[in-house]
Amino acid sequence: MPDFARLRAKRLFLLDLDGTLYLDERLFDGAADFLRAIRSRGGTYRFLTNNSSRGAESYVEKLRRLGVEAETSDFLTSVDALVAHLHAQGMAEKLLYVCGTQSMKRQLTQAGLRLTDDRDAAVDALVMGFDTELTFQKLEDACILLNRGADYLATNPDWVCPTWYGFVPDCGSVCEMLFRATGRRPYVIGKPRPDMAHLAMVHGGFSAEETVLLGDRLYTDIACGVNAGIDTVLVLSGETKEADLAGSAVQPTFVLGSVAEYLSILQE
């Protein structure tokens, strides 16, 4: 019998978005009530997303459109983790060529980082994001820079991004394509690395024992929680199905059908 009392005792809830709380423009049943229940119990939640294609402001707009009140301070993205990593590694002054959306580039520029779209400039590092504005020219530039020996970072390893009609290639798939062309693999910043989870705990002043991470992907969300040393909840509302657990080296602490099931546990 799962120890649901352990889930009721959590104070910091780290939540994935796509496939966990909503899918495209459809908020999952119970999601809004789950968020309200966390705060009514004196808890805190932070949304963690590997999606670098948009900033926190657009996520706030989306959640409000879906009926959920949110502020930019409720979010930590893979771009936030990238900025923290570059500063920690002494790379804040490096010149970056970013394969990413205009929104991602704007976030990096606002963080004080130096960007260029010129592959012939003295580029120090190539940064790959989930680029919904990807062109073949960007791919060609990336190959040229990698063959020249530029440092190589990526915001996330996700193979696909869920949509209402299925999936589209995400950052990980594009990085795999570049590997086939150049033999280079990136240093990956977002989940499954524990950086975002650690940032959320430090900013909020919460311990690992007080924290739980919820997500729908074993290889990013759940692995992030495992790497951060916190309890994890796999929800079966997104990419991962129950049959996938048997062949996975990464295992969650708990498996629930959806956030609505966690809501029921909180209400017991």
Q: What are the language-model segments listed below?
A:
Residues 1-15, 23-41, 54-76, 83-268:
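Asp-based, Mg2+/Mn2+-dependent phosphohydrolase catalytic module
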Residues 44:
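N-terminal phosphate-binding loop and flanking beta/alpha elements of the actin-like ATPase fold
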Residues 51:
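Conserved phosphate/oxyanion-binding catalytic-loop motifs
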